[in-house]
Amino acid sequence: MLRWTVHLEGGPRRVNHAAVAVGHRVYSFGGYCSGEDYETLRQIDVHIFNAVSLRWTKLPPVKSAIRGQAPVVPYMRYGHSTVLIDDTVLLWGGRNDTEGACNVLYAFDVNTHKWFTPRVSGTVPGARDGHSACVLGKIMYIFGGYEQQADCFSNDIHKLDTSTMTWTLICTKGSPARWRDFHSATMLGSHMYVFGGRADRFGPFHSNNEIYCNRIRVFDTRTEAWLDCPPTPVLPEGRRSHSAFGYNGELYIFGGYNARLNRHFHDLWKFNPVSFTWKKIEPKGKGPCPRRRQCCCIVGDKIVLFGGTSPSPEEGLGDEFDLIDHSDLHILDFSPSLKTLCKLAVIQYNLDQSCLPHDIRWELNAMTTNSNISRPIVSSHG
């Protein structure tokens, strides 16, 4: 029984950020917020959400170990990717408006909170943003995105073998997925499932004739082939900048945006890779408003979803030119316990808590007390 259980405001106000879950903590890296200064080159920021205390913290800026020498830290960016391998977060790609796109690989040690740049070899992917990254074992797969130097969408797959730190451009077999950016790629078993994103009628070149494909594409990492997939009778609308995650061998997507429909989404869909069917899911409780460019991480049996951007309430669900960036966080529980359901009842009906144990009252307070680290809200125009 899926249920939205927590809704808190006041976290980092972020759009097109990237995040990973490490135990009961979620690490969020970079992104942007309308109205902030992005002309000045500065370090990427790191926010940590504790899924037990339901509190956000922000790591302090990194100081250089050598006087007069800048520390090894990625610059502030958006449209990048992060994955977790062992105790290391690998951050790749993304761009900002001053430096453009980047193809330097950065590594962040979650134990020491230190950055470093691993020495890599092989065919390094071109700098880009809006790509996807997912992991199978020790290998990170990068697909798609918008390449800066070529000035076009990509449908290449690169892999980084982290045991040797070697990049390889995969010569794929089969009919490849279309060139795209701001799609999702999710690893289920040895197969990578690609959904959505923004493509163009002119193939790799951007002409503002956008396509929002809603067919799922599957890449087999063992044979390095794109698979021929059967038709599916029920499909979500095509979209970009949505969230996707795998849970119990199935793929879920949430939210996103379709410019051709001029519409933001807040729907939740489940894809079963065995039957190759989609099903719309209706969780209990109050979920997030329609949005795109949010982040989503799995912590145990819970989904932590935060940030993103939505149309201003005065503008309806589709207007591109007046967007509100979010500082909120939502938790979707796949298997809420009786204890959780009881706490939700206490909150919903405003029941007396004075007779409850201290730890329960502490948990209720955490579930209803907003964070306080977000900056004031600013509308985004354009």
From Swiss-Prot:
Entry GO MF terms: chromatin binding; ubiquitin-like ligase-substrate adaptor activity
Positions of Kelch repeats: 25-77, 88-138, 139-189, 191-249, 251-301
Keywords linked to the UniProt accession: Cytoplasm, Kelch repeat, Meiosis, Repeat, Ubl conjugation pathway
Ranges in coiled-coil conformation: none
Repeat in keyword set: yes
Entry's Gene Ontology cellular component terms: chromatin; Cul2-RING ubiquitin ligase complex; cytoplasm; cytosol; nucleoplasm
Gene3D superfamilies: Kelch-type beta propeller
Top-level taxon: Eukaryota
Pathway entry: Protein modification; protein ubiquitination
Intracellular or extracellular location(s): Cytoplasm
GO biological process: proteasome-mediated ubiquitin-dependent protein catabolic process; protein ubiquitination; reciprocal meiotic recombination; ubiquitin-dependent protein catabolic process via the C-end degron rule pathway
Role noted for this protein: Substrate-recognition component of a Cul2-RING (CRL2) E3 ubiquitin-protein ligase complex of the DesCEND (destruction via C-end degrons) pathway, which recognizes a C-degron located at the extreme C terminus of target proteins, leading to their ubiquitination and degradation. The C-degron recognized by the DesCEND pathway is usually a motif of less than ten residues and can be present in full-length proteins, truncated proteins or proteolytically cleaved forms.
Subunit: Component of a CRL2(KLHDC3) complex, also named ECS(KLHDC3) complex, composed of CUL2, Elongin BC (ELOB and ELOC), RBX1 and substrate-specific adapter KLHDC3. May form oligomers as a KLHDC3-ELOB-ELOC complex; this interaction is likely autoinhibitory for the E3 ligase complex.
PANTHER family in the record: KELCH DOMAIN-CONTAINING PROTEIN 3
Name recorded for this polypeptide: Kelch domain-containing protein 3
